[in-house]
Amino acid sequence: LYPQNYSLIGSSNLKDLLHALTVALLTFKSFLSDHVGSEFLNLLTIKQYQLLSENLHKTKKLYVYGLPGTGKTIVALKFMEKIRAMLQCTKEQVLYVCENQPLRDFVQQKNICQAVTRVAFLRGIFDDVKHIIIDEAQNFQDGEGDWYTKAWTLTSSPHLPEPGFFWIFLDYLQTSHCYPTGLPGAEWHDPVESLTQVVRNATSIYSYLKEKMEEIVEYPTLNIPRQRLKMLLCRATCAHAVQGCIDIVTHLGRKGVARYVAERCHTYLKKGYSEKDIAILCYRDEEVKAYRELLASEMRKLEFNILLGRMEGGLGKYAVLESIRRFSGLERTIVFGIIPQSFWFHKEILRNILVCVASRANLNLHLLHD
């Protein structure tokens, strides 16, 4: 019943076969696979694999500190797949909670769990849930209620045959507000694992990120676990040697920013990039609306047009024009980050906002100060 060449596998080449199978099993599909109509498989880093394989059997509650671009959401998705397979859970028994609707939509499309925003989690009833994964926890807020206690109570309910998994993924270096998060103080985070190998960003972008992250830790303006983050940064590495590019331009004014973005988008499209490779990120929703009009005007002058859409219903087939906060946890090949001259808590969070924007770019980053 088997092809004849199956009999060619013997003791001499069995090890090579097992090695190849191991590599295949440790891969995950790239978020951007469909860009060229084929599937790319990225290999989990050793640390990502260890975090999944060892802690799955060791601890039910875990804090995962991940530097920007280290694949926290990837690990969260793989973790949910693993607990479903290992414990034979239904997707209704596994709950993923994040702050923003676009990231929720992205995870929902994977069809491996329930996915809700923090606000929906606080308002909803989740009696069937046994396991909870919190992602991007540094940007949660406690204004609508105590999300942490609710999640802890659900996963440690006396009605469960055994405690459920409760994993929290966070990155203090990407904190984008000054309000209480609802998390316990960092001194109460135990046990803790960390991800320090950057897999998302080109080396030029990684170098910029490293510089800004070191500034955040060296001159803290927010309540962050400084010593713990210092240790993470000492271990930070970039997983590849793709150079990419970064361009920082200041004092353009809004019209100048719109002209710059329109011209560069036109150039990228002529080079063969598609609209869905591009994200244009503004600080506030008000600026998203303003730049939509300005960009449309500049594109008409260049006699071309691209579809600009918001992140509704997951990753679209168009260029994204979105706020920085709503794009948290997502990525694009080319990112234009538009940074206003001033905003609320500018002094406290400017460096964090720059890290948030820069870490969304895979290959080409344009930081524009209007």
Tell where the protein language model's regions lie, with residue ranges.
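Exposed alpha-helical structural elements
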Residues: 13-16, 27, 50, 204
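Non-catalytic propeptide/linker segments at domain boundaries
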Residues: 19, 23-40
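Generic structural signal of hydrophobic/aromatic residues within well-ordered alpha-helices
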Residues: 14-21, 28, 209, 295
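Accessory nucleic-acid engagement/destabilization modules that flank
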Residues: 1-23
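Conserved helicase motor core of SF1/SF2 NTP-dependent helicases
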Residues: 35-114, 118-370
